[in-house]
Design a protein with these regions (language model features):
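A generic structural signal for secondary-structure junctions
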Residues: 80, 97, 106, 145, ...
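A short linear hydrophobic-aromatic micro-motif
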Residues: 125, 252-255, 286-291
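Solvent-exposed alpha-helical segments within well-ordered globular domains of core cellular machineries
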Residues: 117, 176, 220, 224, ...
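Preference for bulky hydrophobic residues occupying beta-strand positions
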Residues: 12, 25, 233-235, 264-266, ...
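ABC transporter nucleotide-binding domain
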Residues: 175-267
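C-terminal coupling/interaction segments
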Residues: 269-327
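ABC transporter nucleotide-binding domains
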Residues: 3-7, 12-209, 214-215
Length: 327
C-alpha cells in the first residue's frame, strides 16, 4: 500500500518555542490518520507544513509523493483542506460557493456547475442550495465546507477539528460522510478534540505532546498498551477517604471529577471489586456505584498526556480536581 502522507523528523521553532521536535508519521493510501494531542502540542503546525502553509526548519514532508517544499503547486493540486472555521462566503448561496470553488480549482464553468449539483445532493443540501450561507445552521455550514474542500476530487484531505461545535446528530452525519470519502479511496488526516471521533474514524493514531510523537498505533493497540482496567467509583460522601482507598489500588494518578466520581487505572486482578468494596466500607465511604471497564481512548490520552478529552472538560470541578500518585 503506497504512502500518501509522510512526515519525517519535522522540526519547527517559533521564537523560543519548539513547536515540533522531530515529528514523524505516515498515512497509507485510503486510510484515516488521527493526530491527537493537547492544545499547543504541535498538531496544527504539522498540518500547516504538510499543506504548504508553513515551512519546516528541518526534516521531510511529502504528500502524494511530492515534496511539500520543493513542489508546492503539485501538493496543492491534490489536497483538500477543511479548517476549524468554515471558509465560506456567507453572502453567497451554497451553490454559488461550490461553483466558485470549482472554477478556482481549475474546472470549467459548466464542470463547476455539474460538480456543485452532485455535491449538494450528496451532502443533503439541495433544498438549501439557493439560500445565502449566512442563514445555514452550523451543521449545514460544516457539510458545505467539506463539500467545497473536495470539489476538485483530491486524493488527500486534511481536516482540522471538522466537527467542533456541532450537536451529536450533526457530528454523526459528518462521520458518515467522511467514511464515504474513505470508501471512495480518499486518504484523510484528522485532528480532533473529540477522542470518540478518532476512535470511530481513525485507522491509526499519532499522539503528539510538546512537539514530539509520544505514542502511535491503531486505537485498539493504544488501548491494549495502557493495560489493566479503568476504575470509576461514585461516592455520596467521604471523597478524601475514598481517594486514599482508591489510590492504594491504582497504578497511576487518581482523578476526581464533579459529582464525586473518582477514576484511576488499576491492575486486572481476581477479587479486585470485592476487596475494593470491603475497604471502602471499612473507611466509612458511602458508595453509589462502582464501574470497571477496559480503557477507552480518553483513558489512553489521559495516561499519556495527563489531560482529559477537552470535549468533557466541563465535567471537571476546579475545586475538586486533583491527582495523587498511587502508593
Amino acid at each position: 500500500m503506497s504512502v500518501m502522507i509522510e512526515a519525517g523528523a519535522l522540526r519547527k521553532r517559533y521564537g523560543d518555542t519548539q513547536a515540533l521536535d522531530g515529528v514523524s508519521f505516515a498515512a497509507p493510501a485510503g486510510t484515516v490518520l488521527g493526530v491527537l494531542g493537547p492544545n499547543g502540542a504541535g498538531k496544527s503546525t504539522s498540518v500547516k507544513i504538510l499543506t504548504t502553509f508553513a515551512d519546516a526548519d528541518s526534516g521531510t514532508a511529502r504528500v502524494g509523493g511530492h515534496d511539500v517544499h520543493a513542489d508546492r503547486h503539485a501538493v496543492r493540486s491534490i489536497i483538500g483542506v477543511t479548517a476549524q472555521d468554515a471558509t465560506l462566503d456567507g453572502l453567497l448561496t451554497g451553490r454559488q460557493n461550490l461553483e466558485m470553488m470549482g472554477e478556482l480549482s481549475g474546472l470549467s464553468r459548466a464542470e463547476a456547475r455539474r460538480r456543485a449539483v452532485d455535491l449538494l445532493e450528496r451532502f443533503e443540501l439541495t433544498d438549501a442550495a439557493d439560500r445565502m450561507v449566512k442563514g445555514y445552521s452550523g451543521g449545514m455550514r460544516r457539510r458545505l465546507d467539506l463539500a467545497a474542500s473536495i470539489v476538485n476530487r483530491p486524493p488527500v484531505l486534511f481536516l482540522d477539528e471538522p466537527t467542533t461545535g456541532l450537536d451529536p446528530t450533526s457530528r454523526a452525519r459528518m462521520w458518515d460522510l467522511l467514511r464515504e470519502l474513505v470508501r471512495d479511496g480518499m486518504t484523510l488526516l484528522l485532528t480532533t478534540q473529540y477522542l470518540d471521533e478518532a476512535d470511530q474514524l481513525a485507522d491509526n493514531i499519532v499522539v503528539i505532546d510538546h512537539g514530539r510523537v509520544i505514542a502511535e498505533g491503531t486505537p485498539a493497540e493504544l488501548k491494549r498498551a495502557t493495560g489493566g482496567l479503568v476504575l470509576r467509583v461514585h461516592v455520596r460522601d467521604g471523597v478524601d477517604a475514598a481517594r486514599s482507598v482508591v489510590a492504594s489500588f491504582a497504578t497511576g494518578p487518581v482523578d476526581v471529577t464533579v459529582g464525586r466520581v473518582l477514576q484511576a487505572s488499576v491492575a486486572a486482578e481476581p477479587g479486585l471489586a470485592t476487596r475494593l468494596v470491603r475497604e471502602l466500607d471499612a473507611a466509612g465511604v458511602a458508595v453509589d456505584d462502582i464501574e470497571l471497564h477496559r480503557p477507552s481512548l480518553d483513558d489512553v490520552f489521559f495516561a499519556l498526556t495527563g489531560e482529559r478529552d477537552s470535549s468533557t472538560a466541563d465535567d471537571l470541578d476546579p475545586e475538586l480536581v486533583y491527582t495523587e500518585e498511587a502508593r
